[in-house]
Amino acid sequence: MITSIPLLLSVLWVPILSWINFSSTFFLFGIYYGFLTTLPIGPSQLLSIRAFLLEGNFSGIAAVSGLITGQLLIFLSIFYSPLYVLLIKPHLLTLLVLPYILFYWYKIKDLIDYQSLKPITSIKDTRISKIFFDSFIFQLFNPVVLPSPVLARLLNIFLFRYSNNFIFLLSSFLGWCFGQFLFVSLGKLLLFRIESDSPILYLLVKRIIYRTFSIIILSFSLLHLSRAPVPFITKKLNDNLQFNLSKPEDSFVLTKSWPTLFFDYRKWNRPLRYIENSRFSSQSPIKKKVSQYFFNISLSDGKPRLSFTYLPSLYYFEKNLQKSSINFNLFSSNEIYEKWIKNKKNKKLKIYKEFKNRFKFLDNGFFLAEIIEKKNILSTFEGNIFTKICDPLLIKQYDKKMIVSKSPWLLTEKSYKLTKTQKTLTFSKKDNKLKKWISNQCQEFEDKNFILPWEPLTQDARRILSLLINKSKKTKIDTNLKQMNFFDENATQLLNKQNLSSIENTRKKINRKSNLNWELILNLSPRQKILFLNYLQKDKWNTLKISWKNFFLGDFTQIKNILFLLTKIIKPDQNYQFQEINKEIPRWTSKLKNDKFDVIAIGVTDIRQRKVKNLGYLIKGKDKRRKIIRRFSQQSDFRRKLVKGSMRARRRKTLIWKIFQVKINSPFFLRIMDKPNLNVNNVLKIKPTFQNILEKKKKESLNQKALFIKRTKADRFAIANRWDFPLAQWGRSWLLLIQSHLRKYILLPILIIFKNVIRLFLFQIPEWNQDWYEWNKEIHIRCTYDGTEVSEKELPEQWLRDGLQIKIIYPFYLKPWHNIQNRNNLPNKKNEKLDLIYDDTNFLQNLVKTKEHSNNLVKKKKLNYCYLTAWGFQTNLPFGNIKKQPSFWKPIKKKLKKNMFFKPYQNLKNISTKNKLYKISDVENLKNFNSKKKEYINPNLNNLDFKKKNVVITKLNNQNTLLKQNTDNDIFSINFEYKTSIYINNLENLLKKKHISIEKYLKKQKTLNLKKKLIMIKQKTIKILKKNVQLIKKLPKNLKINIQKIYINLKINKTKLINNISKFFQDN
């Protein structure tokens, strides 16, 4: 006997624990998903927080209670389908959400008086009912602001799935209550903190809160506009209205039903892509229709389970049989289920035994080829094997299936054969008992609404079928350019070319048979079937109209026909329930205009292709046809072949999260884009020596980059991509045009005038003609964004949107003077060439110089051009490296240096040599004038001596050549007869005194060249030694770093080994 409370609890604890262990998964899942429903923040949550902050605890609890009742009503709608259709289906509520939010915002946008900010203290206050009603309605609308409506919908799915599990329902309710309690307590805490921490009066704080919440609700309404489909009349619908103004019967208001009048699921609101059908075959990989989710109880392993893919045709068939009050006692259901379960178990046992025996045979030593099951295959006489799908011996074990036009679930018999005997249909000997029983029972129906497949067609149906077939024969029906919408009531459009083959088959059957049944209609394609039924229904409407007219005219015999037709038309769903329920995929069955290029402002295509930029025109052939050259934009493709009119904001994989976003990325890869920075010091813990080396290397690399950065092809493309959006192209193209006009007509003319005026002031000849000639040669050509030339005066098409480049041919560079060589100075050039030939040492060098001179002349003939940048610089290629311009002041500096330093020094040298020569010549002239007078008289000797003089002088070095030129000018001023011989003799004496000969001079030059080579070799060796010394100095530091790395890696490996060993022992 239990005498105390602890003993009672200990006794009860054991069954409670066993119950929790048994239902722990459902209990935990219920609490988790119940709590998740309170996380998504909607307008009702915002209203309750506003009520807590502005009107106190009492109004906040009223708002939360409205929120809770609204959410409870949504949960109850899962178990009651009419309430679910009203609340969860978005057709009606979508129209009401936005007007109500805007009305509420208009109501609270301005603070009229401060009495509305006073806290509520009693239930009698009228504001409580308003707050409760607002939060209740907003919760029924079920819009979610943050983070996503998925969390709210998860519980709905699980409640529907586990509605029979009491533990899940109870735990989810507990989790939901806990979440609501937490929300209320957090609201109270927020109110308390704001009241206590506010430095000013709380009434003024309330005014700020009032204003902020009105802004939040307005922003929420705008966000709802972007998410929900707006029921506006589109452009295409307007065109249809204008086209059908003359036809009042086909107006869209009368024909379209709710909710497709406002929300047509076939419109391109969703960002769906258009996929064309194959041009060569009628079979398309795209599904034309999908089966709707249909929920009903079905059997799985002999047990009743909820199936979401139950066949609707079976459900309606069962429903009609139940309505007819027939006792279906043909077979007892329990016997069928028991037999089915037994067969399944026997099959499992057989398979298990078969595998067990095979394993035993393998253990006993049999080969695998002997144990594997062997099958017979059909083959031709030639030895060719049939495919598995065509082989009757293997077709049962083949996974694939043949395409069958009929639905296997319709009540049509495949085994019977139709034979024609005196215009009647007879079945074969194999009778279908189920079919006979159903037909006998259906004949006893009072109201025969359910049509069976083997029943014959009525006269009206046969007439309409023949009319349709004759119409398709006369006019080949084509609906490639029209939109099909069969779920609207105006689906009376023509058939596609693809369905003509089935119409031909039906025509042949009509010709063969006189008695037609509904099976022929079942074999038609879905479009033809719906078209036939719509025509049949329209025919009934027309006969009803005619009968009404006759009735009003006085023919009272039409009353029976009117009543009969009205009963048939009012109940259209019960007429033809033999067809399966399916849903057409929301896509256009018609053929849209899908071209490769989407030219803006023309509207050729119905699909948004990738952006195309016009490059220009290319003239080809004798006819000189203009071919448009195009290119795709370098930007990422934000369009992705979407149909015009679709909502791009609802795309899944193309997220836009930046103001200026160059590339398009999926949100899944955003974490890869934002790479975290790695701190090397925290990971490796390196000493400051290593840090100093890294800092030095960074500084050196930065300095090298700052000197001159060469742009590669990839860099140029990257810069072009950055500029390739409309606003940037607009600004850049205007800047380029301004820069070209400034350069051509303002800057360069000013510089030319300034230069020539200064030359006049310096008493130099101005170079107007040369400068203006070079300025006129400069041509500015307008090009497209990629650099293809368009014209000198005309701009390319859409240059503000697509971009612009300006190419400068023969760019003008200002020169301090022009080096114009006189072509009349030919003898000087000839003498120079003779001198070069006589000099054996410099002969090869001079040949190289002549070749370089000829190459330069060829290069000058090539076209000189550059591209202008937006800042006035010049580049060799679009977005390439900035071109270095020749300096104006550099040649002036060189000239000044020569005039200031080199010329005075050379003049002094020349004067000293002249003085020496004059002294020597005067003395020797006095001594040898009388003795060698006879020699001077003979002119032939003088000519020979003069030639010798020239030969000797050319073989001297550069300094002696200068002396020769200066002395020749002085000596030739004296009489030729007397002074030439004196000059030659003087030179010979000088050479004898100094012992200078030509051979010695050549030897000296060779030695000098050898010395230069030796010096070069020494310099290279010194550089190599310096590098080796630096490497030797850095060796200890590098060794330290490598040792530290090895030490760290060893530590990491040790920790990994210890963890692995500990895990191994824990597992064991």
Swiss-Prot record:
Lineage, opening ranks: Eukaryota, Viridiplantae, Streptophyta, Embryophyta, Marchantiophyta
UniProt function note: Involved in protein precursor import into chloroplasts. May be part of an intermediate translocation complex acting as a protein-conducting channel at the inner envelope.
Species name: Marchantia polymorpha (Common liverwort)
Protein name, per record: Putative protein TIC 214 N-terminal part
A Pfam family of this chain: Ycf1
Cellular localization per UniProt: Plastid, Chloroplast inner membrane
Superkingdom of the source species: Eukaryota
Transmembrane segments: 11-31, 68-88, 92-112, 131-151, 166-186, 213-233
Major location category of this protein: plastid
Gene that encodes it: TIC214
Membrane topology: Multi-pass membrane protein
